[in-house]
Amino acid sequence: MAPERVCLAYSGGLDTTDCGQEEDFEAVKSKALKLGAERMIIQDVQQELIDELVWPAIQCNAIYEDRSRAMVKVAKENNCTILSHGCTGKGNDQVRFELAWKACDPTLKVLAPWRMPEFYNRFAGRMDLLKFAEEQNIPVSSTPKAPWSMDDNIIHTSYEAGILEQTEKEPPKDMWKRTVDPMTAPDKPIPFTVHFAKGVPVKLEVEGKVVTGSLEIFKEANEIGRANGIGRIDIVESRFIGLKSRGCYDTPGLTILRQAHLDLEGLVMDSKVRAIRDRLSHDWSTAIYNGMYFTPEREFVEHAIKFSQRQVDGKVDLVAYKGCAYVVGRSSETSNLYSEDESSMDTLDMNWTPQDTTGFIAIQGIRIQKYGERKIKDSEPLTRA
């Protein structure tokens, strides 16, 4: 039998596709070739990542996979029959990779070393691998003094494992790579404006500069967030496989754009539609988090959410300052839901009178009054003695 060819998802780290991470790709390529790789292929999927994942995430207001699709393409072009990754057997990434591969090309086989007994019986964890790398003179970014795992792309940098597994301990200050410390961020507030069309950013204005184009806008938002310490989170999350895990995330640009989008929706979106969209957003976020990007349910939910964004046009003014992006104003020329005259406390310029609210309250109170009467009858009055 002829030997089979393997396409490996490789970043040069301990555990590569150009997803916008701050990476010395020439060094990664050199390292891969020295370790025995036949070829190192680096595909730039930044634009796809922004247009197909980040922009829908903003429309969905998601807090929670183009790399997998790119790997399938490379594997076919290079006659590979096996896809491989370095994900551990305890994480979500293994699920994300392999479910995407099944959708894109179910004929490809999978090689997952962290799930092979001959591998995990020899290397119980990252410290064993660090020791092996040192013995073999293999350079890695992790060290015994900084043993946490770090993954990076244009959207965020994530950190886990090592000292972070002790949930009560504060992350080391030198761990964060994507944002400055909010405590030492510049004392100068930075005003900027984000323009939206159909729920996605189309222009960003900051300090006299006008930025257009999805990738360029996201990079500029990343820079605003980086310089002002915006987008750091430290959470304990529930993985798809059933474990809880602590994760720290540097997500500057997406944090800023999501906040601006949420605020604009408050101005232009019907309240009932927004409530339904909020429920769907959770479904979309869960699908992405669990590796279900290439599924009919994700596609269905995303279409529904995009329909809700047809009138989400306008601009949001913000100020970046020491870890936060503060909204200071918003406007839209397409929505008629907000009326300054109708909302004013100083005028009666509206098509109803204050007396009309008496009937509104009476109708709304019918079931609530009956509930209160039932509680009194059951000797469970809602008033405190």
Q: Which residues fall in each region the model found?
A:
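Nucleotide-activated chemistry modules centered on ATP-dependent adenylation/adenylyltransferase
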Residues: 1-9, 14-385
